[in-house]
Amino acid sequence: MPLLNTITTPYAEAFLQVAESKKEVEKIIAQAKSILQLWDESSELREAMGSPVLEVESKKAALEKIFSGKVTPSFLNFMKLLAERQRIGFLNSVLERLLELYRAQRNIALATVTSATPLNEDQQAALLKNVQSVAGTNNLELNLKVDPDLIGGFVVRVGSKVIDASLSGQVRRMGLELAKVT
């Protein structure tokens, strides 16, 4: 088990158990996804929470101010606990591990779809059906990302399977084929 997992797994497992005991699992999972997005978008938040200079009480006060009323009390207490234990800098990794454990517990496959442009709801629904058939399961969660470097099309990753239907992927494959010919 990688070192990061030895740190994150006990916290993620304990938090999932707390969520189950309070019957807040679905709410906690939705909040975890929102906080992960905020964490990714806010370098200021990451830097402040990861700073060894900022005292624990200041970090807890900041968490209270930012998240009070926006997350369940158990989620806020969990983040404060991470701050007390000097682990708040690992919040994103703990929440990612929490989501992994949740998906594993419920046999949910994660499909990461990277497209050149944002997909509308109809495109998402059509893609979901196709990915479900490829993945062999109807229990699937889509993680949508946008990467303009793909030029057009999309790339789907489900576990170890990768479907590259992007224009940049086609150009790359064509270049490899041309290299074989010459």
Curated annotation (Swiss-Prot):
Gene3D superfamilies tied to this protein: N-terminal domain of the delta subunit of the F1F0-ATP synthase
Membrane topology: Peripheral membrane protein
Localisation per UniProt entry: Cellular thylakoid membrane
GO cellular component terms, A-Z: plasma membrane-derived thylakoid membrane; proton-transporting ATP synthase complex
Keywords: ATP synthesis, CF(1), Hydrogen ion transport, Ion transport, Membrane, Thylakoid, Transport
Entry-linked Pfam families: OSCP
A single MF term (Gene Ontology): proton-transporting ATP synthase activity, rotational mechanism
InterPro entries per the UniProt record, alphabetical: ATP_synth_OSCP/delta_N_sf, ATPase_OSCP/d_CS, ATPase_OSCP/dsu
HAMAP family in the record: ATP_synth_delta_bact
Alphabetical list of NCBIfam families matching this protein: ATP_synt_delta
Self-association state and partner proteins as the record states: F-type ATPases have 2 components, F(1) - the catalytic core - and F(0) - the membrane proton channel. F(1) has five subunits: alpha(3), beta(3), gamma(1), delta(1), epsilon(1). CF(0) has four main subunits: a(1), b(1), b'(1) and c(10-14). The alpha and beta chains form an alternating ring which encloses part of the gamma chain. F(1) is attached to F(0) by a central stalk formed by the gamma and epsilon chains, while a peripheral stalk is formed by the delta, b and b' chains.
Family: Belongs to the ATPase delta chain family.
The protein's name in its UniProt record: ATP synthase subunit delta
